[in-house]
Regions:
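N-terminal strand-loop element at the rim of the active site
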Residues: 20-21, 25-33, 37-92, 177-180
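A conserved mid-protein helix/loop that constitutes part of the nucleotide-sugar donor-binding site
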Residues: 36-41, 224, 228-247, 264-271
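A short, active-site helix/loop in glycosyltransferases that binds the activated sugar's phosphate group
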Residues: 166-191, 199-203
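Nucleotide-activated donor-binding/catalytic signature segment of Leloir-type glycosyltransferases, i.e.
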Residues: 270-286
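Aromatic "clamp/platform" in nucleotide-sugar-dependent glycosyltransferases that forms part
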Residues: 287, 306
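Short hydrophobic beta-strand element within catalytic cores of glycosyltransferases
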Residues: 323-326, 336
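Conserved acidic donor-binding segment of nucleotide-sugar-dependent glycosyltransferases
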Residues: 338-339, 343-350, 358-364
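A short, well-ordered alpha-helix in the C-terminal region of glycosyltransferases
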Residues: 358, 365-380, 389-392
Length: 408
């Protein structure tokens, strides 16, 4: 089912519909992630008298969690590409490609905009083969370092370079990410445009100030709570967070640590906490949908990732006037300024523990930092700014009909 926004009845209603630009937006899967939130917001906004959006999504993995409810809350019913998933499978990917081609042939969109790697590959290829006039891809991160073997990485880079040649524009979400794309020669600089993420901050503000989550989890209200928020996967490096907590607990006991989220490493993390003997200072509440509950009970948010695009948990924390401590990876240094609106530190337990202890000991004196962080994030990462940037891009880019191999 495809949800289309109903306009006011008038004699010109048919003409208005004909003037609409149709977007097919494609994401690899609506798993628990900031990208799923981003895509849901865009699909909602670009459904009005001027735009029509169709959202296509693959299927989340077994331990990734499912956020398909989110676009539905905005009145968007995604079309599921049942063979498109996280893992590489020649047969499933081929079947997914066939389904994508059929949908694009039927819908004849003006624009295809893809998000995340698998959707970027299959979706753009289908758009190229069916002659879609405008093709965009947003990099929410990349897998060019630290993910795969050198041979496999080189292969994926070649695919991205090929697809970029047929893309109208490549979208980076930060200055540092654009620099990476240029460094790996994915596309020429003038083909890459920077559009930072934007968020519906009403989902987390004003946050709950009655410590409901702490009460539910039996966490002392006088303790400083430090959280890692997001999918519990290898790229998020949750073990580093746990080892850092262990170092902190050797020197301070007025703290409590949480890992908020689910993933394939959750059980391993629980085992590590038990092995270190710090289970009394650790809680695993799993995925929590209500952001106001989270940020009403968390004081410090850590990010220990190996790589990132623009991590949503940090932006949400900063908007909620929480202290953030992060490793300087991906696009993080583009918005976390060390000592000004948050803290950056090396990816080792001692360095992170030292920074946590500093923040715990000086918690009351860091109000200036929290307020500065909120002001910057709320102004730069608003969803209205995001919508305006994308509308300008879509409208200012000339449509160019590509070769069409599959339409009649």
């Amino acid at each position: 089912m495809i949800i289309r926004t109903c306009g006011v009845q008038s004699k010109n209603k048919k003409d208005m519909q004909e003037r609409k630009k149709k977007i097919v937006r494609i994401i690899s899967r609506l798993c628990i992630s900031g990208t799923s939130v981003h895509v849901s917001l865009l699909s909602y906004h670009f459904n009005n008298d001027n735009w029509e959006t169709i959202l296509l999504s693959g299927v989340p993995g077994e331990n990734e969690g499912d956020m398909i409810y989110l676009p539905k809350q905005y009145g968007i019913e995604p079309i599921i590409i049942k063979h498109m998933g996280r893992e590489i499978s020649l047969w499933d990917d081929f079947l997914a490609e066939i389904q994508l081609i059929k949908i694009l042939k039927k819908e004849k969109p003006d624009i295809v905009h893809t998000h995340t790697s698998k959707a970027g590959t299959l979706g753009r290829l289908a758009a190229i083969l069916t002659g879609v006039p405008q093709i965009y891809h947003t990099f929410h991160g990349h897998t060019f370092e630290g993910y795969f073997s050198p041979l496999k990485t080189k292969f994926f880079i070649q695919i991205e370079r090929f697809l970029a040649r047929f893309s109208t524009k490549i979208i980076a979400i930060s200055e540092r990410q654009k620099e990476d794309l240029i460094r790996f020669k994915i596309a020429k600089p003038d083909k890459i445009t920077i559009i930072p993420l934007g968020f519906d901050f009403s989902r987390l503000l004003p946050y709950d100030n009655e410590f409901k989550l702490r009460k539910k989890l039996n966490i002392d209200k006088d303790k400083i709570t430090i959280a890692l928020i997001g999918r519990v996967t290898a790229i998020k490096n949750p073990a580093l967070f746990i080892y850092s907590a262990n170092e902190v607990l050797k020197q301070r006991n007025n703290v409590h640590f949480l890992i908020i989220g689910d993933g394939e490493l959750t059980d391993d993390c629980k085992k590590l906490v038990n092995q270190l003997g710090i289970q009394d200072y650790f809680t695993f509440p799993g995925f929590i949908e209500d952001l106001k509950l989270i940020y009403g009970s968390v004081d410090i948010v850590c990010l220990t990732s190996i790589n990132e695009g623009t991590p949503v948990s940090l932006l949400e924390a900063m908007a909620s006037q929480k202290i953030v401590i992060a490793t300087p990876v991906g696009g993080v240094p583009d918005f976390v300024k060390n000592g000004e609106n948050g803290f950056l530190c090396d990816a080792n337990p001692q360095a992170i523990a030292e920074q946590i202890i500093f923040c715990v000991d000086n918690f009351q004196n860091l109000d200036y930092l929290r307020k500065q962080a909120a002001e910057e994030v709320l102004s730069k990462y608003s969803m209205n700014r995001l919508f305006k940037d994308l509308e300008n891009l879509y409208n200012s880019t000339p449509s160019k009909k590509s070769s069409n191999l599959f339409n009649d």
